[in-house]
From Swiss-Prot:
<protein>
    <recommendedName>
        <fullName>rRNA biogenesis protein RRP36</fullName>
    </recommendedName>
</protein>
<feature type="compositionally biased region" description="Basic residues">
    <location>
        <begin position="154"/>
        <end position="164"/>
    </location>
</feature>
<dbReference type="InterPro" id="IPR009292">
    <property type="entry name" value="RRP36"/>
</dbReference>
<feature type="region of interest" description="Disordered">
    <location>
        <begin position="322"/>
        <end position="356"/>
    </location>
</feature>
<feature type="compositionally biased region" description="Basic and acidic residues">
    <location>
        <begin position="322"/>
        <end position="333"/>
    </location>
</feature>
<feature type="compositionally biased region" description="Acidic residues">
    <location>
        <begin position="28"/>
        <end position="75"/>
    </location>
</feature>
<keyword id="KW-0539">Nucleus</keyword>
<keyword id="KW-0687">Ribonucleoprotein</keyword>
<keyword id="KW-0175">Coiled coil</keyword>
<feature type="compositionally biased region" description="Low complexity">
    <location>
        <begin position="202"/>
        <end position="216"/>
    </location>
</feature>
<comment type="subunit">
    <text>Associates with 90S and pre-40S pre-ribosomal particles.</text>
</comment>
<keyword id="KW-0690">Ribosome biogenesis</keyword>
<dbReference type="GO" id="GO:0030686">
    <property type="term" value="C:90S preribosome"/>
</dbReference>
<comment type="function">
    <text>Component of the 90S pre-ribosome involved in the maturation of rRNAs. Required for early cleavages of the pre-RNAs in the 40S ribosomal subunit maturation pathway.</text>
</comment>
<keyword id="KW-0698">rRNA processing</keyword>
<feature type="coiled-coil region">
    <location>
        <begin position="230"/>
        <end position="278"/>
    </location>
</feature>
<comment type="similarity">
    <text>Belongs to the RRP36 family.</text>
</comment>
Length: 356
């Protein structure tokens, strides 16, 4: 309820009493005294009502922002008969307005309750303020709001796979490639030798793992002559490489053929070394199992000890070194030394890589 309406009510009440006193001059003195007492009672009631209204205004002032702006417009609506209002009512009204207009240092003119409520507009400056207009806060753009929202979110870390056989973990925000396969060519048929196929071996042994391993061992023994064929093929390829290297006038075809032969020799030799390493590990494992059985039969051990994969590899390397000749050992040690030195050089800082 605006203050101007309250002032109008009080003015009307006092005017009615004054007019009544002026026109009732012929009445008795007792009636005049009673009228004066009634006027004083009405003034006290009006002051009490003004106090109640001022307290209500203090409570409602924190929720209504438009009351402060209406104070300036109320001055033009007040009648010129404000001189009849009592000074006590004016002082109380001024005190209530002073409490509502007093700015705070933390909120800059906004009440503490109003400062806590988000989305509220700052109150309009009143007539009792210093006259300085508060500058409106600049509105953030949508892009800035988006950046602020993303900045508050903690970065999500992808958990690592439990093992190398687990599926790859990838974020759902990963961009999909724009390349699409329209026509998929038919798969190229691969040659499969049933003698060494694990599917055929497991099917022939009715899924028994031990029997399948024995079948693979027997197949390896039965076709051991293929190793000699591979060695002969590698020797023939090396002869072709030597003839091409000694050729004086080399064409582009000769250069390409020489590079192809070198790649083929490297691939076949690596495959041959892999076969030999696996055969060595298998022999180490067979010998260990044989020793464990003998110890259990003699009663020296109650349970066998099963070698781990790393232990099998270490024993296979030691056995291979014992079977090597002097020159082969030196070559193997030199290759090992160069390999370790290369790893250390990669881990070394750039400033220390230069040899003084």
């Amino acid at each position: 309820m605006p203050i101007s309406s309250k002032f109008n009510q009080r003015v009307r009440a006092r005017l009615e009493e004054d007019e009544f006193e002026q026109f009732s001059g012929e009445s008795t003195s007792d009636e005049g005294l009673e009228g004066g007492e009634s006027v004083e009672d009405e003034e006290e009631q009006e002051e009490n009502s003004a106090e109640d209204h001022s307290e209500e205004d203090d409570d409602e002032g924190e929720e209504d922002d438009d009351d402060d702006g209406d104070v300036e417009d109320s001055s033009s609506d007040i009648n010129p008969s404000l001189n009849a209002i009592s000074f006590g009512a004016l002082a109380k009204a001024q005190a209530s307005l002073g409490k509502r207009k007093r700015p705070t240092a933390s909120t800059g003119g906004i009440s503490p309750k109003r400062a806590k409520v988000p989305g509220r507009h700052s109150p309009t400056p009143s007539a009792s303020s210093s006259g300085e207009k508060q500058e409106p806060e600049p509105e953030l753009s949508e892009y800035q709001k988006h950046l602020a929202a993303n900045a508050k979110k903690p970065p999500q870390k992808l958990t690592h796979r439990t093992s190398k056989h687990a599926p790859t973990i990838q974020s759902s925000r990963h961009a999909v490639s724009r390349k699409r396969t329209i026509l998929e060519p038919p798969p190229v048929p691969k040659a499969r030798d049933p003698r060494f196929d694990s599917v055929v071996l497991s099917h022939s042994t009715n899924g028994n793992s031990s029997t399948a391993s024995n079948a693979a061992i027997h197949a390896r023994k039965n076709y051991a002559f293929l190793d000699s064929y591979r060695k002969d093929e590698i020797a023939q390829l090396r002869k072709q490489v030597s003839t091409l290297q000694t050729k004086k006038h080399k064409t582009n075809y000769d250069e390409r053929e020489l590079a192809r032969l070198k790649r083929q020799i490297t691939s076949m030799s690596d495959r041959q070394r892999t076969f030999e390493r696996k055969e060595m590990e298998r022999e180490v494992l067979v010998q260990h199992r044989r020793k464990e059985r003998e110890l259990i039969r003699e009663g020296k051990k109650s349970q066998p000890y099963f070698l781990k994969r790393g232990e099998v590899k270490k024993e296979a390397v030691a056995k291979r070194f014992t079977e090597m000749s002097g020159k082969e050992k030196q070559r193997a040690l030199e290759r090992r030394r160069k390999k370790v030195a290369g790893k250390e050089r990669k881990e070394m800082p750039w400033g220390r890589r230069v040899v003084e």
